[in-house]
């Protein structure tokens, strides 16, 4: 069986990002979101996440790899803030710009998640697919995040077992500062496109969230 988790990063980055992520869950194929806990829109995101009972909600950590001595304290504060906002433990853990992959950061994170039994992106039995992204080499590549681009990824990258595809949908509002901006609205349209949902059905891929991992992995 092929199982697919579709996770939105940057939940809480702005009200427009929050709105797009919730839409991608309610109208599209999104099954999980990763929450930034220290942003102005974090409280709104957490409230929206609590309303979306079928959407797995994890934490999107912001850590300073250049000051590794501070990482344990940053980690503890952000995990505590997540619990405060969501009133539950995270279903999964990842990080802004994948900083958790840095060898100066990773041991601290794995020590906590090992005790808590929470999967870390790229360090669990869930295969991570990061190719649904519309920018590289300083150039925008909308073809990678359009419908045809996503269908190619489904065919080439989703295998037997559990795969996580991360994405960055959202609405870009005035004042939103990010090098990855207009691409987010393209991602949102793609995730909500009926052709994508039908393609997943045709390929016998089952959409799940992180809460479904034990059943999917036969644990």
Stretches found by the model and what they are:
Residues 11-15, 35-44, 64-71, 96-105, ...:
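Acidic-and-aromatic substrate-binding clefts and catalytic sites of carbohydrate-active enzymes
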Residues 9-11, 36-38, 60-64, 96-98, ...:
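Active-site beta-loop-alpha junctions enriched in small/polar residues
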Residues 3-5, 30-34, 54-60, 90-92, ...:
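Structural preference for beta-strand elements that scaffold enzyme active sites
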Residues 1-15:
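Boundary/entry segment of secreted carbohydrate-active catalytic domains
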Residues 81-158:
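Catalytic domains of cell-wall/extracellular-matrix polysaccharide-remodeling enzymes
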Residues 61-92:
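Active-site gating/metal-coordination segments in enzymes
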Residues 178-219:
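C-terminal domain-boundary segment and adjacent tail
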Residues 21-27, 42-58, 80-86, 156-159:
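Acidic (Asp/Glu)-rich catalytic clusters
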């Amino acid at each position: 069986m092929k199982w697919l988790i579709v996770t939105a990063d940057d939940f809480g980055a702005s009200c427009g990002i929050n709105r797009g992520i919730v839409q991608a869950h309610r109208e599209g194929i999104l099954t999980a979101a990763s929450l930034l806990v220290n942003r102005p829109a974090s409280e709104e995101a957490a409230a929206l996440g609590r309303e979306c009972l079928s959407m797995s909600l994890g934490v999107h950590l912001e850590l300073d790899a250049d000051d590794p001595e501070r990482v344990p304290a940053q980690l503890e504060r952000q995990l505590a803030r997540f619990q405060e906002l969501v009133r539950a433990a995270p279903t999964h853990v990842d990080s802004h710009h994948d900083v958790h992959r840095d060898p100066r950061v990773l041991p601290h994170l794995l020590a906590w998640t090992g005790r808590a039994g929470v999967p870390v992106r790229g360090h669990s039995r869930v295969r991570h697919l990061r190719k649904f992204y519309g920018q590289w080499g300083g150039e925008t590549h909308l073809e990678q995040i359009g419908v045809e681009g996503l269908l190619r990824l489904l065919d080439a990258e989703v295998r037997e077992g559990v795969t996580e595809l991360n994405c960055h949908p959202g609405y870009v509002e005035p004042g939103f500062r990010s090098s990855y901006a207009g691409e987010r609205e393209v991602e949102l349209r793609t995730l909500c496109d009926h052709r994508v949902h039908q393609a997943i059905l045709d390929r016998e891929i089952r959409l799940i969230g992180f809460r479904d991992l034990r059943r999917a992995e036969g644990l």
